[in-house]
C-alpha cells in the first residue's frame, strides 16, 4: 500500500503578513463600496509602531486610510503597547498614487465585455473530494485551528492568548485516502504570566480537541504546542509583515500548484485574484459533478487581451471523462474573460476583507464556492 504524509500550515489574523493583507483588503472594500469600477492595487507593510500603505488606485472614491487602518488593527486585537503594536498609537503612512495610464489603456474597452486582462499571468484552481467542502484536509484543519485560537481569545475562554498564532497539520495517507493525523503544531502568542503547562492544557482542551476529528487522532499522533517554550513577543514587533506573503496559506496549502500572484489589495480586474477565484469555481463544480475526484485547472492571460491564452486540466487519474472533454465543458459553461468572470461571480463589490484571513477557499459564504454548475456539467458530460 502506498503511504505518504502531507503537511499544510496556516496563520492567524494577528500574524504580521495577515495584518497587512487585511488592511489592503479593507482599503479595497472601502473603495469598491463607493466605486465598483475602481482600479485598486494596495500594498501594506507593518512593523513595530508603524503601518505603511502604498500602491496604485484609480477611483472617484475617497477613503480615510488612517482611520480604516486603525479600525482594522483594532478589530484584530492589537490594542495595547504591551503587545508591541497599538491601533491607536501606531504611525500610519499613506503612499497611494494613481494607476499608470498605460495599464488603463490595455484594460479598458468601449465594449466592457472585451475588457483586457490587467496583467499577464497564470492561475490555478483546485478541488478534491477528501472533505465536504471539496478542499484538501491539511489546509482545512490548519485554518480551523487558528480560527479557533481567535475565537477563544476574543470570547475570553483563554484570556491570556494574544493575536499572533501559527498552525501546521500533517496528515497520513494510504492510497491517497486519509488514515489519520500524524503531527500537529500550534504556536500561539501569549501574555507573560501564563505557565507553559497551563498553556499546553488550554490549547489542547479548548483549541485542538474541539477542532480535529477524534477518529483521525491516535496514541501515535505527535503534538507540538509552543515548542520554543515562550511566545510573548509576536505580531509586528516580532516580524515585519507584508501584503501577499502568505499565498500558499491563502490557497491550497501546497496541495495544488500556484501561479505566484497574491490576492489581497487587488480589484477584480487583476486576474491574479479574479481568475484564481474562477479557477476554484470551475474545479469545484467539476468535482461536485462527479466528473473527477481531484481536479486542478490552470488558466493564463496576456495583458490587454480578453480571452485566456490557455486552459488546461489535470485530474490525477481520477477523471470520469477525458481532460479534452472537461476543457470543452469548461469553455461551454464558464466565461473566463476578465469581464465575464467578474460578472459570473459578482466580484465588483466589497467582499474581500473577510477573505484576507483563514483562507480564500472552502468557505461557502463566497460566490466562487457555489456548485450551481455541477448538474449541467454532469448532464452535458453524459453521466
From Swiss-Prot:
Q: Which GO terms describe its biological process?
A: one-carbon metabolic process; S-adenosylmethionine biosynthetic process
Q: Mention any one GO cellular component term assigned to this protein in its UniProt record.
A: cytoplasm
Its EC number(s): 2.5.1.6
> What note does UniProt attach to the cofactor annotation?
Binds 2 divalent ions per subunit. Binds 1 potassium ion per subunit.
- Quickly give the catalysed reaction: L-methionine + ATP + H2O = S-adenosyl-L-methionine + phosphate + diphosphate
Q: What does this protein do?
A: Catalyzes the formation of S-adenosylmethionine (AdoMet) from methionine and ATP. The overall synthetic reaction is composed of two sequential steps, AdoMet formation and the subsequent tripolyphosphate hydrolysis which occurs prior to release of AdoMet from the enzyme.
Please describe the quaternary structure of this protein.
Homotetramer; dimer of dimers.
Report residues binding K(+).
Answer: 43
**Keyword Metal-binding recorded:** yes
Listed name of the protein: S-adenosylmethionine synthase
Which residues does the record give as L-methionine binding sites?
Answer: 56, 99, 239, 270
Annotated positions binding Mg(2+)? 17
- Keywords assigned by UniProt? ATP-binding, Cytoplasm, Magnesium, Metal-binding, Nucleotide-binding, One-carbon metabolism, Potassium, Transferase
What the entry lists under PROSITE patterns is as follows: ADOMET_SYNTHASE_1, ADOMET_SYNTHASE_2
Q: Which family does it belong to?
A: Belongs to the AdoMet synthase family.
Amino acid at each position: 500500500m502506498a503511504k505518504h504524509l502531507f503537511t499544510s500550515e496556516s496563520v492567524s489574523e494577528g500574524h504580521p503578513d495577515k495584518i497587512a493583507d487585511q488592511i489592503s483588503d479593507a482599503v479595497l472594500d472601502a473603495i469598491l463600496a463607493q466605486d465598483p469600477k475602481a482600479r485598486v492595487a494596495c500594498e501594506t507593510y507593518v512593523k513595530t509602531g508603524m503601518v505603511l500603505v502604498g500602491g496604485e488606485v484609480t477611483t472617484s472614491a475617497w477613503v480615510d486610510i488612517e482611520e480604516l487602518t486603525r479600525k482594522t488593527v483594532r478589530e484584530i486585537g492589537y490594542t495595547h503597547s504591551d503587545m508591541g503594536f497599538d491601533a491607536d498609537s501606531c504611525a500610519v503612512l499613506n503612499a497611494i498614487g494613481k494607476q499608470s495610464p498605460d495599464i488603463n489603456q490595455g484594460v479598458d474597452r468601449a465594449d466592457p465585455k472585451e475588457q483586457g486582462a490587467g496583467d499577464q499571468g497564470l492561475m490555478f484552481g483546485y478541488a478534491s473530494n477528501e472533505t465536504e467542502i471539496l478542499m484538501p484536509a491539511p489546509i482545512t484543519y490548519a485554518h480551523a485551528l487558528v480560527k479557533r485560537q481567535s475565537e477563544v481569545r476574543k470570547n475570553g475562554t483563554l484570556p491570556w492568548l494574544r493575536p499572533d498564532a501559527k498552525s501546521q497539520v500533517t496528515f497520513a495517507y494510504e492510497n491517497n485516502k486519509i488514515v489519520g493525523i500524524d503531527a500537529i503544531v500550534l504556536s500561539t502568542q501569549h501574555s507573560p504570566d501564563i505557565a507553559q503547562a497551563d498553556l499546553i492544557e488550554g490549547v489542547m482542551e479548548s483549541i485542538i480537541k474541539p477542532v480535529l476529528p477524534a477518529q483521525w487522532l491516535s496514541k501515535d499522533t505527535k503534538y507540538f504546542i509552543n515548542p520554543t517554550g515562550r511566545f510573548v513577543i509576536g505580531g509586528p514587533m516580532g516580524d515585519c509583515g507584508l501584503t501577499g506573503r502568505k499565498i500558499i496559506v491563502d490557497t491550497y496549502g501546497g496541495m495544488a500548484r500556484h501561479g505566484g500572484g497574491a490576492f489581497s489589495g487587488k480589484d477584480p480586474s487583476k486576474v491574479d485574484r479574479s481568475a484564481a477565484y474562477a479557477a476554484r469555481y470551475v474545479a469545484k463544480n467539476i468535482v461536485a459533478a462527479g466528473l473527477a475526484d481531484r481536479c486542478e485547472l490552470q488558466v493564463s492571460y496576456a495583458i490587454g487581451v480578453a480571452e485566456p491564452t490557455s486552459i488546461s486540466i489535470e485530474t490525477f487519474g481520477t477523471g470520469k471523462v477525458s481532460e479534452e472533454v472537461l476543457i470543452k465543458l469548461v469553455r461551454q459553461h464558464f466565461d473566463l474573460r476578465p469581464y465575464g468572470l467578474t460578472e459570473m461571480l459578482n466580484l465588483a463589490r466589497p467582499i474581500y476583507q473577510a477573505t484576507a484571513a483563514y483562507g480564500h477557499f472552502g468557505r461557502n459564504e463566497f460566490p466562487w464556492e457555489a456548485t450551481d454548475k455541477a448538474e449541467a456539467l454532469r448532464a452535458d458530460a453524459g453521466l
